[in-house]
Amino acid sequence: MFRTISNIFRVGDLRRKVIFTLLMLIVFRIGSFIPVPGTNREVLDFVDQANAFGFLNTFGGGALGNFSIFAMGIMPYITASIVMQLLQMDVVPKFAEWAKEGEAGRRKLAQFTRYGTIVLGFIQALGMSVGFNNFFPGLIPNPSVSVYLFIALVLTAGTAFLMWLGEQITAKGVGNGISIIIFAGIAAGIPNGLNLIYSTRIQDAGEQLFLNIVVILLLALAILAIIVGVIFVQQALRKIPVQYAKRLVGRNPVGGQSTHLPLKVNAAGVIPVIFALSLFIFPPTVAGLFGSDHPVAAWVIETFDYTHPIGMAVYALLIIGFTYFYTFIQVNPERMAENLKKQGGYIPGIRPGKATQTYITRILYRLTFVGSLFLAVVAILPVFFIKFADLPQAIQIGGTGLLIVVGVALDTMKQIEAQLIKRSYKGFIK
């Protein structure tokens, strides 16, 4: 790992990509501190907020707590992406057709995803501006329809800029731009979290100091165990044996070798967690339009609180559902079976074609069950950590944040390593 990091700066092209990515993240962090005009951020207080707003603040690197131009983060884009992927599943025939057209079709779908981001972002921004002014009186000193619309437009523009920033990182930097931005937001909150632990559990602890240190050490061990578990599950594979039949090409026998088909335990990576989080946050944000005094809005806000038993169950089910959904987008058993048949390959004891497809699908369902359950369990661990250690809710230790940070870090390092390997072998190819 450390060798890979040192090698990055020896390759000019890769070095430029890494520097470009870092510069884009600096722009993101600067924007997180630029407040929306016409607002008073001093009235916002997200300490001990264990609801959707606390989540959004954590994953935006504190941008929501500053009520900055990036307060909504990249979540509307993720929600729009989910909607577009659902519509591609023969719901909208034109979208399904574009999905099969390769690069040209993907460009058209990406354009519609951008349009969807703007629409959903504006709805969410309007709900956020009205709702936050109800929750935190004085946030908008002179509320009116025109002021609310202006603030919604500024927040939507901030999300659109982040979307563009993510696309630039993907095209000219390293890793998936959207995931990198979310990663940066979570990582930016780590120093504040550590400082909060110190101020609440170490500073002026008195006679409780030793006990608090023991609890914090146990917590650190638990977090380390989660990180190891996440890496293990992300790297775990099920190897299905594949045999290729011998055939004659001219007078030479070709094929006959044995290999394997690798299926990951968690083929979807951390994308299901990001998708679930985006969808989980959306309803309470929109409910904010009606204020906490409205009975239905109050119920939605309370239910979509991840410390609430129902909210916890909904969040876990969303993660499990999206893991299955995204796994079968990433891995297509029908296409795999078809390719094996065309190449003269078969799984020992399984007939080529439909039987192979059914076999791969069955194994994929079992693997995904384990992977999705692991993601769901780890994602809701912060609730138990916080209660066990009696820590402020704002710290949001472990769980979703750890999954995203470790998952994105692993994926990015793999991409960088692949780039390094490609450059190392360039001389042999020539």
UniProtKB/Swiss-Prot annotation:
What cellular component terms from Gene Ontology apply here? plasma membrane
* GO process annotations (BP): intracellular protein transmembrane transport; protein targeting; protein transport by the Sec complex
Membrane topology note: Multi-pass membrane protein
- List membrane-spanning regions: 18-38, 67-87, 118-138, 145-165, 177-197, 213-233, 270-290, 309-329, 369-389, 390-410
Cell compartment(s), UniProt = Cell membrane
Q: Which UniProt keywords apply?
A: Cell membrane, Membrane, Protein transport, Translocation, Transmembrane, Transmembrane helix, Transport
Query: According to the UniProt entry, where is the signal peptide?
Result: none
Quaternary structure (record): Component of the Sec protein translocase complex. Heterotrimer consisting of SecY, SecE and SecG subunits. The heterotrimers can form oligomers, although 1 heterotrimer is thought to be able to translocate proteins. Interacts with the ribosome. Interacts with SecDF, and other proteins may be involved. Interacts with SecA.
NCBIfam families noted in UniProt:
3a0501s007
Q: What does this protein do?
A: The central subunit of the protein translocation channel SecYEG. Consists of two halves formed by TMs 1-5 and 6-10. These two domains form a lateral gate at the front which open onto the bilayer between TMs 2 and 7, and are clamped together by SecE at the back. The channel is closed by both a pore ring composed of hydrophobic SecY resides and a short helix (helix 2A) on the extracellular side of the membrane which forms a plug. The plug probably moves laterally to allow the channel to open. The ring and the pore may move independently.
Family membership: Belongs to the SecY/SEC61-alpha family.
According to UniProt, the name of this protein is Protein translocase subunit SecY
Species name = Halalkalibacterium halodurans (strain ATCC BAA-125 / DSM 18197 / FERM 7344 / JCM 9153 / C-125) (Bacillus halodurans)
Supply the source organism's classification.
Bacteria, Bacillati, Bacillota, Bacilli, Bacillales
Tell me the name of the encoding gene: secY
